[in-house]
Swiss-Prot record, chain A:
Quaternary structure and interacting proteins, as annotated: Component of the RNA exosome core complex (Exo-9), composed of EXOSC1, EXOSC2, EXOSC3, EXOSC4, EXOSC5, EXOSC6, EXOSC7, EXOSC8 and EXOSC9; within the complex interacts with EXOSC5 and EXOSC6. The catalytically inactive RNA exosome core complex (Exo-9) associates with the catalytic subunit EXOSC10/RRP6. Exo-9 may associate with DIS3 to form the nucleolar exosome complex, or DIS3L to form the cytoplasmic exosome complex. Exo-9 is formed by a hexameric base ring consisting of the heterodimers EXOSC4-EXOSC9, EXOSC5-EXOSC8 and EXOSC6-EXOSC7, and a cap ring consisting of EXOSC1, EXOSC2 and EXOSC3.
A Pfam match: RNase_PH
Residue(s) carrying N-acetylalanine: 2
Disease: Pontocerebellar hypoplasia 1C: A severe autosomal recessive neurodegenerative disease characterized by cerebellar and corpus callosum hypoplasia, abnormal myelination of the central nervous system, and spinal motor neuron disease. Affected individuals manifest failure to thrive, severe muscle weakness, spasticity and psychomotor retardation. Vision and hearing are impaired.
Compartments reported by the entry: Cytoplasm; Nucleus; Nucleus, Nucleolus
Gene Ontology CC terms: chromosome; cytoplasm; cytoplasmic exosome (RNase complex); cytosol; exosome (RNase complex); fibrillar center; intracellular membrane-bounded organelle; nuclear exosome (RNase complex)
Gene3D superfamilies, per database record: GHMP Kinase, N-terminal domain (3.30.230.70)
Name the record gives this protein: Exosome complex component RRP43
Signal peptide limits: none
Family: Belongs to the RNase PH family.
UniProt source species: Homo sapiens (Human)
Main location: cytoplasm
Length: 276, 233
């Protein structure tokens, strides 16, 4: 009977739960879904991570290749993210060129990388003016159940922490690059940006980590990306109902706690992986 | 038929330094707005902020493709064309921001199963482009007579490395700044409708408060420009 009511009046069904300060899946308004992360599962990629936020699953693979730097930045490498939302993850996506959602997510991840300075592009330089590393970060969503931006940011961070670049020397006689696959080193990750997404309901209520259905019923969304010093890398609010300054401050404090949780989880996973 | 209105909006009195047109306080550049300049769209507006200029045209409410129609509201579409080159992923991201902002204010339920299309063309970019696009879109929607629950305006601010806030930054100020924040605020309660930020910063409250104060000037400019237009005819 409840299922019938849910189909006919989804918003009313939802409001009944919100009145009791909880959600249909039993979570509180400020509670995140269970987050699990698996690092280093793809052996063919230089770095990889799989993140599950409840049902939302995103896998990130990082491949490093050589490239010639551009003339106006001869000592800077490139980090090229791409988010793919294939028809596999949800019925709303069709096959073909990337839709708007995928493009917006790709631009968001590119902005986070650029704003947070997660990797110093100068670290990716092998020989100024001649050879630099380019890191292709491919994020593929395997299951879309809302809050794709948080999952993608986490997957990207975990994968970059897993990337090992081999040592490259330029042979002076032949001017060719020699790759020493036996000597690999991790990337220097300077900051750890963590995203926290909120959905706005009925212009007043804010809930954390919306599922797919909640995102559909929400009147607005907000994503805050914070690094460990409490600095904001990105305050992404793509329209939707208005928010007052006070509500914004509440969201920021929630984002700070989330950052601590995520960082702890990631440190645990990396520590458990080290003896290889 | 055309109305051109200019105004100088200032928040604090300038010190009158000759080298930079604005002091380290908060003041907006010279605004200008021209409405109803294109003959084909239902509404059009050109918004100028200093040297940044955006032309907006609105078609709607018009017929919508069955695949895109929503049974109880109007379908809003935003197309943003850059000055040079083909539209890319960055334009798609901006289109989404502008579209969601417009969806929050436009009363779509009055025109179900129709489409409202906002087309924006960047004429020149000298900083604060997203804010200028938002202002142009709002003026064009007003010119087209699309019912809205509030007006909205875009305000950009830049934070440089020593923490000073500059409103409505030029391209040079944007490049040198530590962070550039663009906000869209509504006219009724000055609530935050849209926010898009670039760079690393920690003080949102101060920027938001400054943007809210600046938005008063922008809304006053809207009101004056519309009053002047309708009082003559």
């Amino acid at each position: 009977m409840a299922a019938g009511f849910k189909t006919v009046e989804p918003l009313e069904y939802y409001r009944r739960f919100l009145k009791e300060n909880c959600r249909p899946d039993g979570r509180e308004l400020g509670e995140f879904r269970t987050t699990t992360v698996n690092i280093g599962s793809i052996s063919t990629a230089d770095g990889s991570a799989l993140v599950k936020l409840g049902n939302t699953t995103v896998i990130c693979g990082v491949k490093a290749e050589f490239a010639a730097p551009s003339t106006d930045a001869p000592d800077k490498g490139y980090v090229v993210p791409n988010v793919d939302l294939p028809p596999l993850c949800s019925s709303r996506f069709r096959s073909g060129p990337p839709g708007e959602e995928a493009q917006v997510a790709s631009q968001f991840i590119a902005d986070v990388i650029e704003n947070s300075q997660i990797i110093q592009k100068e670290d990716l330089c092998i020989s100024p003016g001649k050879l630099v590393w380019v890191l292709y970060c491919d994020l593929i969503c395997l299951d879309y159940d809302g809050n794709i931006l948080d999952a993608c940011t986490f997957a990207l961070l975990a994968a970059l922490k897993n990337v090992q670049l081999p040592e490259v020397t330029i042979n002076e006689e032949t001017a060719l690059a020699e790759v020493n696959l036996k000597k690999k080193s991790y990337l220097n990750i300077r900051t750890h940006p963590v995203a926290t997404s909120f959905a706005v309901f009925d212009d007043t209520l804010l809930i954390v980590d919306p599922t797919g259905e909640e995102e559909h019923l929400a009147t607005g969304t907000l994503t805050i990306v914070m690094d460990e010093e409490g600095k904001l890398c990105c305050l992404h609010k793509p329209g939707g109902s208005g928010l007052t300054g006070a509500k914004l401050q509440d969201c920021m404090s929630r984002a700070v706690t989330r950052h601590k949780e995520v960082k702890k989880l990631m440190d645990e996973v990396i520590k458990s992986m080290k003896p290889k | 038929m055309e109305e051109e209105t200019h105004t100088d909006a200032k928040i604090r009195a300038e010190n009158g330094t000759g080298s930079s047109p604005r002091g380290p306080g908060c003041s907006l550049r010279h605004f200008a707005c021209e409405q109803n300049l294109l003959s084909r769209p239902d509404g059009s507006a050109s918004f100028l902020q200093g040297d940044t200029s955006v032309l907006a045209g609105v078609y709607g409410p018009a017929e919508v493709k069955v695949s895109k129609e929503i049974f109880n509201k109007a379908t809003l579409e935003v197309i943003l064309r850059p000055k040079i080159g083909l539209p890319g992923v960055a334009e798609k991201s901006r289109e989404r921001l502008i579209r969601n902002t417009c969806e929050a204010v436009v009363l779509g339920t009055l025109h179900p199963r129709t489409s409202i299309t906002v087309v924006l063309q960047v004429v020149s970019d000298a900083g604060s482009l997203l804010a200028c696009c938002l202002n142009a879109a709002c003026m064009a929607l007003v010119d087209a007579g699309v019912p809205m629950r509030a007006l909205f305006c875009g305000v950009a601010c830049a934070l440089d490395s020593d923490g000073t806030l500059v409103l409505d930054p030029t391209s040079k100020q944007e490049k040198e700044a530590r962070a550039v924040l663009t906000f869209a605020l509504d006219s009724v309660e000055r609530k935050l409708l849209m926010s898009s930020t670039k760079g690393l910063y920690s003080d949102t409250e101060q920027c938001l408060a400054a943007a809210q104060a600046a938005s008063q000037h922008v809304f006053r400019f809207y009101r004056e420009s519309l009053q002047r237009r309708y009082s003559k005819s």
